Amino acid sequence: MKISAAVLTVVLMAASLCAPASASPNGSDTIPCCFAYLSAVLPRAHVKEYFYTSSKCSNFAVVFVTRRNRQVCANPKKKWVQEYINYLELK
């Protein structure tokens, strides 16, 4: 039973790092909106730039763009997100 609980935990953690935290266009509009935040800290070396979601989106978020051009949503209230923004601004 402990093994299946551990496997389930790993699967759920992996799933939380996937698509729900990605920025997606809102309908036919090309403005990305976020519906969930990344639950883990993104390695800073992977981040090349960032932008904020539009006020038209229901959730305010920071969208980090990775070196592979993947857009990842992050909670702007998290300390690590604010530190990454400061780092990118000073870069």
Curated annotation (Swiss-Prot):
Which SMART domains does this chain map to?
SCY
PROSITE patterns according to UniProt: SMALL_CYTOKINES_CC
Alphabetically ordered keywords of this record: Chemotaxis, Cytokine, Disulfide bond, Inflammatory response, Secreted, Signal
| UniProt xrefs under InterPro entries | Chemokine_b/g/d (IPR039809), Chemokine_CC_CS (IPR000827), Chemokine_IL8-like_dom (IPR001811), Interleukin_8-like_sf (IPR036048)
Gene Ontology cellular component terms for the protein in this record: extracellular space
Q: Which GO terms describe its biological process?
A: antimicrobial humoral immune response mediated by antimicrobial peptide; chemokine-mediated signaling pathway; eosinophil chemotaxis; G protein-coupled receptor signaling pathway; inflammatory response; positive regulation of cell migration; regulation of insulin secretion
Subcellular localization: Secreted
The record's function comment reads: Chemoattractant for blood monocytes, memory T-helper cells and eosinophils. Causes the release of histamine from basophils and activates eosinophils. May activate several chemokine receptors including CCR1, CCR3, CCR4 and CCR5. May also be an agonist of the G protein-coupled receptor GPR75. Together with GPR75, may play a role in neuron survival through activation of a downstream signaling pathway involving the PI3, Akt and MAP kinases. By activating GPR75 may also play a role in insulin secretion by islet cells.
Q: Which PANTHER family match?
A: C-C MOTIF CHEMOKINE 5, SMALL INDUCIBLE CYTOKINE A
Q: Which family does it belong to?
A: Belongs to the intercrine beta (chemokine CC) family.
Q: What's the protein name?
A: C-C motif chemokine 5
UniProt source species: Sigmodon hispidus
